[in-house]
């Protein structure tokens, strides 16, 4: 009989592996005795086994919807309003315990939901009940149960067996990777644990990552490049875009290895705070394999065309965002369409928000360069401090609302007082308590027309965990530190040579931005600086990529990434800003201990040998 995965028992029984161990006498399916089904009925056919696997897709947390005013940006991108219960505020203050518990009793973190908040197993269609921490452990156990029962899959073709096994291996590696990125090396759980005494060792980051890499590499060999081109995928033809594929597995294999190769993780594992060259080469190979599938048309993933760029993050027609660029997104539940959880984050009260908006920090906005491809502080960039929003990188205009941008398209003359973004000092969009604190608003993830006048219908926001642009950047980084120069490439197929420089330029070209200037192509350090800036521009506010980047590069403590600033200014007669002053609003508290999140103390003390993360 299948064993129960009960999240309450899972969290308590887990000693420090936190939530891994389950009470073995629980039944997996909470059925009445007369409704009991056998293992063979669950695992015997492709259709029934795939139903078992489907739940793991629902363990992928939508990081934008932990609450109706979710704070997932915990690095240097944004400033929240001045209320003290925001997760962003606590992380700025160095209070990383806030991921796990809050003084207000209201857990705002997508990383954790306590056992009392999770209905049943927390994988049902209730996005506010999902937490990355418990559901990752749950997903790992579920994958192990599936792998332990593969021998029961008898009514299936070899293709169907491969697809089932590939998904199970992928999710086991993926969920371990999700946990590692925040909490470091962990035990790698590759079997179904019982109720016996727990003595699994905590591994180094490298050791954990290499075990995840084995699973992800095996998954890549088994999964299809495109489900629509398989017999198994015909039953869901045209609705397979969010399923994991060969490309997804290669992309996460590369990410897993690149993270393990990065300075922070390499130092934790070996004491050496530089890149691990061999792991970078392995990462480059995995990313290359992912990109090659798209290059040859075997996989459907492509960079979204520029005129549809916003559809990577939100749509206005009720369709799920992301296609064809996103490789990994959470599930979207259609009962959410009528509940607009994003207005409060993106718009001030005057446009229909509830006073809980986030605003991009001016210090972060300075990452956006000029239309000629140069950083704003580079010689010859053409940046004019007296006219700071003219001639910028096209991605600036897709991502940022600045003073004077038209927000309301319709309405009447009575709406003219708020038709344009009044973000100057004293403007009706500028308010520390209910509007912009910085002089900017975030446009990237939400349409300007999603206001209380235009009120565009059917707007869906769903930024994913990984998209193809990220793969290009990570490939460039892996090649740079695996093979030595921006002009280096992974030695793959002779018909597809891709240098590190090429990979970055492909993403820039999508936005009509010229290639990286020659002055940044002469050394690893110069090109790395452009990779850092490019990732800040292209991947802003996506899946805590920035938080992970700053930490893994070990630049988290540098003052330029700790100071969050606002731009104070008046609006001049010509509509241009005057009397501009950059003001430090927050200096983020970052010490050595802030390279990792603390582990739940109540669970660490149950298993002292496991150990808390340093400094916590």
Please name every model-derived segment.
Residues 26-106, 186, 243-427, 558-574, ...:
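An aromatic- and glycine-enriched ligand-binding surface/loop that stacks and positions planar moieties
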Residues 22-24:
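C-terminal motif of bacterial Sec signal peptides marking the signal peptidase cleavage site
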Residues 2-14:
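Bacterial N-terminal signal peptides that target proteins for export
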Residues 178-182, 187, 227, 259-268, ...:
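Short coil/turn linking the two alpha-helices of tandem helical-hairpin repeats
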Residues 46-51, 58-64, 91-183, 197-232, ...:
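Conserved, well-structured interaction surfaces
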């Amino acid at each position: 009989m299948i064993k129960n995965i009960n999240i309450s028992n899972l969290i308590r029984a887990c000693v420090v592996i936190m939530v891994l161990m389950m009470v073995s006498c629980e039944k997996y399916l909470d059925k009445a005795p007369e409704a009991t089904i056998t293992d063979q009925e669950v695992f015997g056919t492709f259709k029934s086994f795939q139903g078992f696997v489907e739940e793991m897709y629902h363990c992928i947390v939508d990081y934008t919807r932990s609450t109706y005013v979710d704070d997932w940006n915990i690095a240097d991108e944004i400033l929240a309003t001045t209320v003290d219960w925001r997760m962003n505020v606590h992380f700025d203050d160095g209070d990383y315990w806030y991921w796990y518990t809050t003084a207000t009793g209201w857990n705002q973190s997508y990383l954790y939901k306590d056992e009392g908040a999770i209905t049943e197993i927390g994988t049902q269609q209730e996005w506010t009940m999902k937490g990355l921490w418990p559901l990752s452990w749950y997903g790992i156990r579920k994958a192990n149960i599936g792998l332990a029962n593969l021998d029961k899959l008898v009514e299936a073709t070899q293709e169907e067996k491969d697809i089932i096994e590939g998904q199970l291996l992928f999710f086991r590696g993926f969920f371990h990777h999700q946990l590692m990125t925040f909490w470091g090396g962990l035990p790698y759980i590759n079997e179904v644990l019982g109720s016996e005494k727990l003595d699994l060792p905590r591994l180094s980051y490298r050791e954990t990552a290499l075990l995840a890499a084995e699973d992800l590499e095996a998954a890549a060999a088994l999964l299809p490049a495109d489900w629509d081109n398989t017999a198994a995928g015909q039953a869901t033809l045209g609705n397979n875009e969010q399923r994991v594929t060969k490309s997804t597995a290669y992309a996460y294999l590369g990410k897993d290895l690149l993270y393990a190769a990065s300075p922070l993780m390499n130092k934790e594992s070996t004491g050496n705070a530089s890149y691990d060259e061999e792991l970078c080469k392995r990462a480059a190979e995995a990313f290359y394999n992912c990109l090659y599938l798209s290059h040859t048309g075997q996989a459907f993933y492509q960079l979204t065309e520029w005129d549809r760029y916003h559809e990577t993050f939100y749509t206005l027609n009720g369709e799920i965002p992301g296609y064809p660029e996103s490789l990994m997104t959470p599930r979207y539940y259609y009962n959410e369409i009528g509940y607009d959880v994003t207005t409060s984050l993106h718009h001030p009260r005057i446009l229909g928000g509830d006073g809980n908006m986030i605003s991009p920090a001016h210090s972060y906005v300075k990452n956006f360069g000029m239309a000629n491809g140069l950083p704003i502080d580079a010689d010859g960039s053409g940046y004019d401090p007296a006219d700071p929003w003219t001639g910028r990188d096209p991605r600036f205009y897709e991502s940022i609302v600045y003073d004077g941008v038209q927000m309301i398209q319709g309405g009447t003359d009575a709406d003219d007082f708020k038709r344009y973004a009044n973000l100057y000092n004293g403007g009706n969009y500028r308010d520390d308590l209910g509007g912009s604190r910085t002089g900017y608003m975030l446009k990237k993830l939400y349409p300007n027309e999603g206001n209380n006048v235009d009120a565009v219908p059917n707007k869906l926001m769903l930024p994913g965990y990984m998209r193809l642009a990220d793969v290009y950047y990570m490939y460039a980084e892996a090649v740079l530190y695996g093979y030595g120069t921006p002009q280096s490439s992974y030695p793959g197929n002779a018909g597809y040579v891709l240098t590190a420089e090429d990979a970055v330029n492909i993403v820039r070209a999508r936005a009509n931005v010229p290639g990286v200037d020659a002055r940044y192509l002469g050394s690893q350090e110069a090109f790395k600086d452009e990779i850092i800036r490019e990732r800040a521009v292209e991947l802003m506010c996506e899946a805590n990529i920035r938080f992970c980047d700053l930490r893994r590069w070990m630049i988290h403590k540098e003052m330029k990434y700790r100071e969050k600033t606002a731009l104070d200014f008046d609006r001049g007669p010509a509509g241009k800003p005057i009397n501009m002053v950059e003001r430090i609003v927050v200096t983020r508290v970052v010490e050595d201990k802030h390279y990792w999140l603390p582990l739940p103390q109540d669970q660490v003390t149950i298993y002292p040998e496991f150990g808390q993360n340093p400094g916590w």
